[in-house]
Amino acid sequence: MADQHLIIELKTLSEKLDGDIRSDSASCILYATDASPYREIPLAVARPRTNQDIKKLILFAREHKLSLIPRTAGTSLAGQVVGSGIVVDVSRYMTRLLELNVEKHWIRVEPGVILDELNQFVATHGLFFGPETSTSSRCMMGGMVGNNSCGAHSIIYGSTRDHLISVKVILSDGSEA
């Protein structure tokens, strides 16, 4: 159980975010597992709306020596999104298709975009994002990048990394790369 001082500081941080932070028991229990058999109740769950929210979370975690656990849909079978720190769930608010360039065959998306929804959108332009995962109706682009997801036809279409031109990330010091 986190000390009261840390809970108060989390509430103060939440007021500075466009997104939200939840530290109630029910929310934390919901994020204690993914599709794996592993289970660990996190300190809190943050749902950022913006990159600035993520940067504020990073600074808070560094100051308090807490881990941040990035999460999208939680469909992985290996427990990557389970931990005792702050789960950073981008699946709630960071779900936009930002820009499509049909001529050059690329799209820019936020990490919470669901694979099937992405493919439904680009199919209207004769395009397809190659990795065919068994969880395509719920897996999200951020998790696919983090896991280098692949699928039944990877020998033909390749894995996620084979379809990336670039990735914009926020590093552990809060800088962007």
Predicted regions and their residues:
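N-terminal accessory segments
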Residues: 1-35, 60-68
